[in-house]
Amino acid sequence: MKFIPEITLLLLLFVHSTQAKGKRRKCPEGAWSEGKIMNTIMSNYTKMLPDAEDSVQVNIEIHVQDMGSLNEISSDFEIDILFTQLWHDSALSFAHLPACKRNITMETRLLPKIWSPNTCMINSKRTTVHASPSENVMVILYENGTVWINHRLSVKSPCNLDLRQFPFDTQTCILIFESYSHNSEEVELHWMEEAVTLMKPIQLPDFDMVHYSTKKETLLYPNGYWDQLQVTFTFKRRYGFYIIQAYVPTYLTIIVSWVSFCMEPKALPARTTVGISSLLALTFQFGNILKNLPRVSYVKAMDVWMLGCISFVFGTMVELAFVCYISRCQNSVRNAERRRERMRNSQVWANGSCRTRSNGYANGGSVISHYHPTSNGNGNNNRHDTPQVTGRGSLHRNGPPSPLNLQMTTFDSEIPLTFDQLPVSMESDRPLIEEMRSTSPPPPSGCLARFHPEAVDKFSIVAFPLAFTMFNLVYWWHYLSQTFDQNYQ
């Protein structure tokens, strides 16, 4: 009793094998083998056009097996396809022969011996037939003379790249099929009802295949009209990578460059370091992106963004230079005011006396001056007659003054003397006073002295973010709207 399950299983297997043999088609007696049929066909076959009166109708379809990445530098992409051709050749019909099957799988060595439309991809850069391990070609001959050929191909085909919208761009790549040897009077090419099929979802590192389409055209060559079949693949770039690797770092770099507005105007080394570091960082990021793109003469969306960001960082450097300039201008104004105050404290007053407007000098607000010059025996002034201004704003001559030739005078007159009104005894003081006035430059001309560095920084810390926000609104609205329009089309 313990062997009942094993016996039941054996009986079921026997019944199933018997039913399978009953369903198997039996060849009639006297049926020819495939080799004998092919030898008979090829013995009388001539490799000429199948139909001399009309053009041969060739139907084509492709099955997309896989795709490689789209290369922007070389402007091409790689694709693996199963390329199928179907046509009718009455000379290969074996319906009149006693065949066991209605179709025969031919050896690939017989393919060069039969007529073919010689269809090729005229725009491919490279096309190879897979060999793993043998050549991946299948030829099936039907009893009515229909020939079905399938090649497993690896194709490298060009793409029409337009990078104006990069990295929000949409690219198209085209495969073009033609008969290399026969024009449309001999061979007509047609797409099958389901011309292109995807064997699996296509996922590329940088792109999504969003659409594909087929069409047929007729082109005029010097030797006639030729049928041309085209399949167009549309790819949309995944820009998430560039958002993370390009846009976010530039945002951070721009914000870092604005930190200099919060520093003191006197912190020139720190502000310069921040600005130059931000500028170098943006330049490095821009170059890192451009090295993976072809050299095109038009402006890309990424170019607009990077150049705009570089302009904003450069603007912070210009603002720094402006702040430094007006800071120096303010210092010059303050220094000029101090020097003018010292000049007012050392003016020459009427009647040969000098009165200071400050209250810190000795001698009751008077200075000592040589009122009557003395001369030596040669009639020349003594070397002690050279006037000098003391550190307290007093004017005296070199050398120890003599009581005989000194006179102290004080007046209440506030009318200053001009050089023409100076007494003869003070004519020798004219160069000294002129030198004093020439060493005190006038304040800077123009209205830059009215600005204050702190006010410029406060204005910049508001104006730069507002301008950058406006730039962002215009930039993203322009390019994203064009991207949506392309998707809609």
From Swiss-Prot:
Free-text tissue specificity from the UniProt record: Expressed in a subset of muscles, and head and tail neurons, including RME and GABAergic ventral nerve cord neurons. Expressed in AIY, RME, RID, RIF, ASI, DD1-6, and PVN neurons.
One GO cellular component, as annotated: neuronal cell body
Disulfide bridge map: none
Glycan attachment positions: N44, N103, N144
Chief location of this protein within or outside the cell: membrane
Any single biological process term in GO: behavioral response to starvation
Record's protein name: Serotonin-gated chloride channel mod-1
Annotated localization: Membrane; Cell membrane
Keywords: Cell membrane, Coiled coil, Glycoprotein, Ion channel, Ion transport, Membrane, Plasmid, Signal, Transmembrane, Transmembrane helix, Transport
Listed Polar residues bias regions: 372-391
Residues in compartment: Cytoplasmic: 325-458
Source species, domain of life: Eukaryota
Signal peptide segment: 1-20
Matches recorded under Gene3D superfamilies: Neurotransmitter-gated ion-channel ligand-binding domain, Neurotransmitter-gated ion-channel transmembrane domain
Lineage: Eukaryota, Metazoa, Ecdysozoa, Nematoda, Chromadorea
Function: Functions as a 5-hydroxytryptamine (serotonin) receptor. This receptor is a ligand-gated anion-specific ion channel, selective for chloride ions. Relays a long-range endocrine signal from the body cavity neurons to modulate distal adipose triglyceride lipase atgl-1 function, via the nuclear receptor nhr-76. Together with the G-protein coupled serotonin receptor ser-1 involved in male mating behavior. May mediate an inhibitory effect of serotonin on egg laying.
Pfam family name, one: Neur_chan_memb
Binding site for serotonin: Y180, W226
Membrane-crossing segments per the record: 241-261, 274-294, 304-324, 459-479
